[in-house]
Amino acid sequence: MKRIVHIAALLALCLLASCGTDREHLLKVYNWGDYIDEDLIPEFEQWYEEQTGETVKVVYQTFDINETMLSKIEKGHEDFDVVCPSDYIIQRMLNEGLLLPIDKDFGNTPNYIDANVSPYIKSVFTKIADGGIDANDYSVGYMWGTTGILYNAKYVDPEDARTWDVIRNPKYAGKIFIKDAARDVFCPINIFLHQNQLKAGEVTMDELMMDSSDESLEAFEAFMAQVKPLVAGWEADFGKEQMTQERGWLNFTWSGDAEWAMMEARDLGVDLRYEVPQEGSNVWFDGWVIPKYARNVKAASYFINFLCIPENAIRNMDFIGYVSTVTSAEILEAMSDDELEETVDVRYLFGDIEGADEAHLDPTLYPDASVIERCVMMRDWGEETPKLITTWSRVKGSNANAMTMVVIGLFFAVLLVLGIRKKFFSKRRRRHYRKK
């Protein structure tokens, strides 16, 4: 299917060229699969002409892992105009000089980027780059979330789920699924293993996110050696379905996947809940950037601005199932649910918008300020990254349980192809795989 999509995109380029469409009137977008409401694409083309008096045709292509996208730009010098990497790749591209600044002078068109992107997201983005560069000049946040524990309240004590130590609790042996994402697992566990140093003020959370020391990697590997016999599978995408079917009781996962699973589980009468453990965790972000080899920088900037219109952000959230970095009164109202008894303080995200201090929002998608206080953004390790990847390979090793779950995953894939599980596709609640 990916090959078909790629070929279709190339054919589209050839067809447009044969029809006399100049490159300056094309906008090449490179994004994750299922990561935008594609009805917005033709709407953008019309909106762009209304705003600028110029025509543009979007050529839309998708990738499945960050490294595929990065390689095409870094080594292949492909002329994508706007792409959507994850946080650590944005940092790497900035440090390697692969990004162009985003022009936010839109003339008579409102600057929706500066008006609507969360102040919290902007503050976090200032920490991405080295050398005093403000990443907000080169990137705009798109979606974000946390990493935590999804658990079945029927089998798992909620108190157990409040700590990362739950994944080595023998009570849940054979019922634990862990994301096959080295950085997303290492960083929270490294925080857990350094609790004494954190409490003593000997180290900060930000420092732990950049900790690639041999001592920490060895401690992580030793911890995971105790976890491995309890693990049913290392998963990139199928863990949430195992949770909804009660084949799994614990899932080390992303908030968006957790939300998808909880929605599906409600229909099945399964009580799934999500917790960001008390020791702390990481927040992840994806954002839009303009690569240095782009050939339609103007349309790229307008495209990013278009996606920051609250109505469009709401549509993307509804389609994708993740949380937009765009925050406004309209979004707060649209995402509120008065049936939720507990409220969350999301002033860190929405600023001084009325009602943000006691908002009736889903805490899985919109964590309370008290949760965010113990979360930090992951950073790129640069040349140290291979050390983590090597450690992670040893952690997983060869595992009969993991292989069993791969077989189960393939079985469900066949069912999907046959259309037996169309329900899961209809909601599009899937998170792309953030390879670390």
Where are these regions (language model features)?
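Hinge/lid segment of periplasmic solute-binding proteins
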Residues: 61, 67-70, 87, 91-144, ...
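Ligand-binding "clamshell"
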Residues: 94-102, 134-136, 261-276, 338-343
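Conserved C-terminal helix/tail region of periplasmic/extracytoplasmic solute-binding proteins
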Residues: 357-436
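Mature extracytoplasmic/periplasmic domains
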Residues: 291-371, 432
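C-terminal motif of bacterial Sec signal peptides marking the signal peptidase cleavage site
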Residues: 15-18
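Early extracytoplasmic/lumenal segment of secretory-pathway proteins
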Residues: 20-96, 397-405
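Ligand-binding pocket segment of bilobal, Venus flytrap-like solute-binding proteins
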Residues: 175-178, 185, 189, 198-273
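Periplasmic-binding protein-like
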Residues: 110-112, 218-226, 268-292
